[in-house]
Amino acid sequence: VPDHVVFMNTRGEFQFSIKSYGYPLLDSGGEFLYSINTDLSGLKRIDREGQILWSLTFPVPLTTAALAGEESVIGLMDGRLLLVGAEGEVIYEQEAGGSRIPVILGTAITEDRQQIALFSGIDPQSLSILQRRDNEFVSEVTLDLDSDFRREVDLSFTPDARFLYFEVEEGLGVLDIRKKTTAGILSPGVLRSLDAATDFSAAAFRTERGSNLLIFRPLSSVLLSRQLAVPDVFLRIIDNSLILGIDGFLLRADLAER
C-alpha cells in the first residue's frame, strides 16, 4: 500500500499528491477518489486536499467495488450489494441468492448509474444486470454460469451500456444486454486488467511467459494482440489513449485505426 497517491495528467505531468489511507480507487472520470481499508473493513471518500469526506465500515469484508461519479457500488462477503450515495449514505441494498455461498465477487456500474452488473455466488455462480427504476433496481438479465471463481471477478460496461465484459476461464465473455446473448474472446492466462472505451476496449492477461495485451471491440475480431515480457500490467483508457502501468513506469499509447 503506498504512503501517498500521486495524480498525473495523460501527458505524465505531476498534478498533486495526497496521503494514502489504504487501497486507492479513482472513478472512471478521474474526479473522485476513494480508499478501501487495508483490512477490507470499510470505504472512505477523500477530497483533493486529502481530507476524509465520509467513512463507512462493514461487519464483513468488502469483496468488490465499482465507482461512477459520486456513487459507489459495494459487494460484501455475506452476499449483500450496497449502492452508496454522495454523502456516504446507503441508498439501495440487495442480497444475492440462489447459491450455497452468496458472496459478491464482482460488480460494475454504468456511467449514467442506471445499470449495475453483479457477479455473485459460489456453487453455483451467476451474472445479473440490474436496471434502475426510480429508487429501486429490477433484474434485466440473469445468466447461470459454470465457472468456479473464488476471488474477485472483473466486469466492465462499454460506455454506451450496450455490452458487458466479464471474466471467464482463459478469456472474456461479452454480454449483449439488449439481445441477451453472449459471445467470447479467447486469450491464454488470467485476466489482470480490463477497461472499455467508446472506440475500443483493452485487456491484459497474465501468462506463463509474461502478459498478453489485447485491443478489441465487442462482437468483432481482435484488433491487436501483443505479448509483453512482464507478468503484471495495469491499463486504463482515456479518450483514445491507452495508459499502461508496467514495472513502476506509466506509458501512454495513442491508438489510431489505419
Model-derived segments and their meaning:
Residues 163-258:
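Hydrophilic extracytoplasmic domains
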Residues 2-8, 40-44, 79-84, 124-130, ...:
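Structural motif
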Residues 32-34, 72, 115-116, 164, ...:
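Hydrophobic beta-strand positions that form the internal "hydrophobic ladder"
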Residues 55, 61-140:
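Solenoidal tandem-repeat scaffolds enriched in leucines and small polar residues
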Residues 1-31:
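Post-signal peptide N-terminal segment of secreted/secretory-pathway proteins
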Residues 10-19, 50-57, 90-98, 138-146, ...:
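A short beta-strand motif characteristic of beta-propeller blades
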Residues 19-31, 57-70, 101-109, 147-156, ...:
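Repeated scaffold domains used in trafficking and secretory/extracellular systems
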Residues 11, 49, 78, 87, ...:
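Solvent-exposed strand-loop boundary residues in beta-sheet-rich modules
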